[in-house]
Amino acid sequence: MDRAGRLGTGLRGLCVAALVLVCAGQGGRREDGGPACYGGFDLYFILDKSGSVLHHWNEIYYFVEQLAHRFISPQLRMSFIVFSTRGTTLMKLTEDREQIRQGLEELQKVLPGGDTYMHEGFERASEQIYYENSQGYRTASVIIALTDGELHEDLFFYSEREANRSRDLGAIVYCVGVKDFNETQLARIADSKDHVFPVNDGFQALQGIIHSILKKSCIEILAAEPSTICAGESFQVVVRGNGFRHARNVDRVLCSFKINDSVTLNEKPFAVEDTYLLCPAPILKEVGMKAALQVSMNDGLSFISSSVIITTTHCSDGSILAIALLILFLLLALALLWWFWPLCCTVIIKEVPPPPVEESEEEDDDGLPKKKWPTVDASYYGGRGVGGIKRMEVRWGEKGSTEEGAKLEKAKNARVKMPEQEYEFPEPRNLNNNMRRPSSPRKWYSPIKGKLDALWVLLRKGYDRVSVMRPQPGDTGRCINFTRVKNSQPAKYPLNNSYHSSSPPPAPIYTPPPPAPHCPPPAPSAPTPPIPSPPSTLPPPPQAPPPNRAPPPSRPPPRPSV
């Protein structure tokens, strides 16, 4: 593999480990309130113990101690490596917290001295990464290298070569430069310039970059949704966490499922965001199978582990629910048919009696208060006897009288007493103890209750209207049936439009019978008187409506004599 290829692979591996560190800083909080990382990966500290840091070793130790306590995942492993003229592994890779505590004690006892051979420290880290990969773990690795000086040209070449070798094994490399460092050299040793943390204010400022390292290097898996799936069905899983877009190339991010600690299946996610991944999951055919969720940031070269487990369970299909809904729908349809069928089939005509008119004693028909009318002494009109002997008063507008009655002309000496008030208002009702009923305060739900009451009245009115139309027991009727009858002969247009279907048919036209045969008249036995000549003018016919039709004559009309 060429140098560029090894560099790219190593950078991807280091990115994965660094992202895990960032997740630790973002994913949770420690008991003391500081940021923490729950990512599961291998963390290597490569520390410069050359003579230039002789008087600043305590600052370096406290920096490592504080940073180590931020990674609290039980699946995280840690190693301490120091370098000067040669590299030394103070503590091998371990997840045992007691051994980590002892390793920190050994680190505190280190006496700095010697030259700055950074490549020696990278060699010790690459050896452990290679050994762990050969064991089949393939865990993501993060390397944090700290130095305070500028490397000579040949030492820089060796350091860059060993850093590329670590990247080829799947590690992500971060560099911390203190005071007199060469930032260009550290940018080439680390994955990129963004993976370099400069501390220009000296060793006492190391505590200020702990949060930045956690934020940039931690990738953690917090949860999976759903965590329980149906056996034998395909599904998609949403991986919740932090730092998923911290990879150098998001196209190389993979979701990994380790099934029953034996088979590992990798799937490319549909969506990659900083706080979640949307991944297709493999089909788990048996009930009780478990799949441990992992994430790879370098196309499967190494993986960030987690404690998130996806389990399978037995699920029933939705056919039972569909059948139940279908039965419920059929029952509802039958109920509606039973209710509305008599309305469509049985025709019952009833005359609904008019509603009784309630006479209000307090108000008129138009809803206005009862009007007070003038009191007239009817004795002057002749009421109660001749001449109005007995006194009688009449209030206009009461007991059959109308307002127009008040406009009648009164007698000259009639006495009229006008009321003090024109309208008579109803008095408020009192309780049994002669106390008025207090008005109830308006509640917050009064508008809602009013609208619901109005809706209920509307529904009730519609129900009563339909209920009245339904036939009662004992009612008889006939089902409506529409039949279309085809006529073989087309209808003829009437000859005379003056006759309608409601008038009787016209009378047939009368035809007189043929005249009788001509016979000679017999000889006259006596002279006949002369026939008077008809008058020149005829009297007008009587003014009477013409008959509808004339009856036919019983005999032929006489012929005029010559």
Swiss-Prot record:
Extracellular domain ranges by topology: 26-319
Protein's name in the database: Anthrax toxin receptor 1
Biased composition (Pro residues): 503-562
Entry's localization field: Cell membrane; Cell projection, Lamellipodium membrane; Cell projection, Filopodium membrane
Cytoplasmic compartment residues: 341-562
Post-translational modification: Glycosylated. Phosphorylated upon PLAU binding.
Basic and acidic residues bias locations: 400-420
Subunit structure: Interacts with gelatin and type 1 collagen. Interacts with the actin cytoskeleton.
Membrane topology listed for this record: Single-pass type I membrane protein
Residues the record marks as carrying a glycan: 164, 182, 260
Function of the molecule: Plays a role in cell attachment and migration. Interacts with extracellular matrix proteins and with the actin cytoskeleton and thereby plays an important role in normal extracellular matrix (ECM) homeostasis. Mediates adhesion of cells to type 1 collagen and gelatin, reorganization of the actin cytoskeleton and promotes cell spreading. Plays a role in the angiogenic response of cultured umbilical vein endothelial cells. May also act as a receptor for PLAU. Upon ligand binding, stimulates the phosphorylation of EGFR and ERK1/2.
Biased composition (Polar residues): 490-500
Annotated GO biological process: actin cytoskeleton organization; blood vessel development; negative regulation of extracellular matrix assembly; substrate adhesion-dependent cell spreading
Family as reported in the entry's similarity comment: Belongs to the ATR family.
